[in-house]
Regions:
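Coiled-coil dimerization/phosphotransfer module
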Residues: 1-108
């Protein structure tokens, strides 16, 4: 993992949501990605925290709309999206078949 910037605290609900999003993302890497490597990066600025979880696994086709996650069997991804929305954070999931997945979280 890598941390950039000055670490700073955040309220308990945000901190727990960020922790759970990272935890579920890494669980997905272990369970589904068939990855050799995974990386977690945290970037602290004065007003935001950026979190990136990335792997070199098999990747997948990301549905255009998060509401489609359950239809495609991606219940964990729906949970990530819901947790991000609760804390007014922005979550992006990028993946390419055969090239891995990148999950980014922007917390204000």
């Amino acid at each position: 993992y890598k941390v950039r910037g000055q670490e700073r605290g955040m309220d308990a609900q945000k901190a727990m949501s960020v922790y759970r999003i990272v935890q579920e993302s890494l669980n997905n890497v272990i369970r589904h990605a068939e990855a050799k490597h995974a990386w977690v990066e945290l970037d602290f600025t004065d007003s935001e925290v950026f979190v990136q979880i990335r792997d070199d696994g098999k990747g997948f086709v990301v549905p255009a709309n998060p509401a489609e996650f359950p239809e495609k069997g991606h219940f964990g991804l729906l949970g990530l999206q819901e947790r991000a929305e609760i804390i007014n954070a922005e979550l992006k999931i990028l993946s390419t078949t055969g090239q891995g997945t990148i999950i980014t979280l922007q917390v204000r």
